[in-house]
Amino acid sequence: MGEPQGSMRILVTGGSGLVGKAIQKVVADGAGLPGEDWVFVSSKDADLTDTAQTRALFEKVQPTHVIHLAAMVGGLFRNIKYNLDFWRKNVHMNDNVLHSAFEVGARKVVSCLSTCIFPDKTTYPIDETMIHNGPPHNSNFGYSYAKRMIDVQNRAYFQQYGCTFTAVIPTNVFGPHDNFNIEDGHVLPGLIHKVHLAKSSGSALTVWGTGNPRRQFIYSLDLAQLFIWVLREYNEVEPIILSVGEEDEVSIKEAAEAVVEAMDFHGEVTFDTTKSDGQFKKTASNSKLRTYLPDFRFTPFKQAVKETCAWFTDNYEQARK
């Protein structure tokens, strides 16, 4: 009681992951404002698939604002195998977080979606209006539908209670504290780990697939700044895509070259074309973001890759891999 009118207590779920750690760093480096109290929690603090534990956490923290990053995630092959688990765990977690936020009277919730939720058959570039236009890719339908339901639930909280519960849709995020597991991580951290191993063993680097698919990569520290902007300034319930522009899309081959350059690797680079390429592209439009923030400057891709490679090398023992 007696808190000044502008004060905010922000609870960040999934606080130990890639994006959570980036928000923590950006806040510590000066993005936090006076009157803001940031609380970062991870699965060690509460099992968010458990309603009672989630409610107890929210009762204890009493957040005015929530950034919901926690999710059960995995690479392509784990998704294919465990679609039911990805659906159930994420649906339980999301419902528990959103409803606990509602029950403690949180003024705003910003959840994190993913571009994989978009319809498999679509036109490009993808934009925020297309989320529910058709089924997602069959490989990870459990995860994708669970994430889509956050948007459905946000709209229902707004319609029934006027809540400002919204969501952001980042493209391919990378940066320090990523999961650098080669089998189960995403493409860029997997490449960084592979180059590190090839360099230390003096062997060739093998990139899976043709190297032709194209992706929009966003640096986790840029995404963290945008998350904080959304939390403070973005008041729509409709989601917003957080991404570099369409012109900044890079091929997997170009991404591999950036990692090779950043890590000063001089060995042979080969492409294993027996491995699947996945979707050729998932180009997303950031024109909605640009109408709000025309001057936001993203970290240049090569610089962000360099910083991430340096972090991985310096923290090799502790890094998730």
UniProtKB/Swiss-Prot annotation:
- EC assignment: the record states 1.1.1.271
This protein's GO cellular component annotations are: cytosol; extracellular exosome
Question: Active site: which residues?
Answer: 143 (proton donor/acceptor)
Site (Important for catalytic activity) location in chain: 114, 116
Among the Pfam families in the record, one is: Epimerase
Q: Which GO terms describe its molecular function?
A: electron transfer activity; GDP-4-dehydro-D-rhamnose reductase activity; GDP-L-fucose synthase activity; GDP-mannose 3,5-epimerase activity; identical protein binding
Pathway listed for it is: Nucleotide-sugar biosynthesis; GDP-L-fucose biosynthesis via de novo pathway; GDP-L-fucose from GDP-alpha-D-mannose: step 2/2
According to UniProt, the reaction catalysed is: GDP-beta-L-fucose + NADP(+) = GDP-4-dehydro-alpha-D-rhamnose + NADPH + H(+)
Q: Where does NADP(+) bind?
A: 14-20, 147, 170-173, 186
Q: Does the keyword NADP apply?
A: yes
Summarize where substrate binds, as residue positions.
194, 208, 215, 277
Instruction: Note the site residues: Lowers pKa of active site Tyr.
Output: 147
Give the keywords, sorted: Isomerase, Multifunctional enzyme, NADP, Oxidoreductase
Family membership noted in the UniProt record = Belongs to the NAD(P)-dependent epimerase/dehydratase family. Fucose synthase subfamily.
Q: What does this protein do?
A: Catalyzes the two-step NADP-dependent conversion of GDP-4-dehydro-6-deoxy-D-mannose to GDP-fucose, involving an epimerase and a reductase reaction.
Q: How does it assemble?
A: Homodimer.
Protein name (database record):
GDP-L-fucose synthase
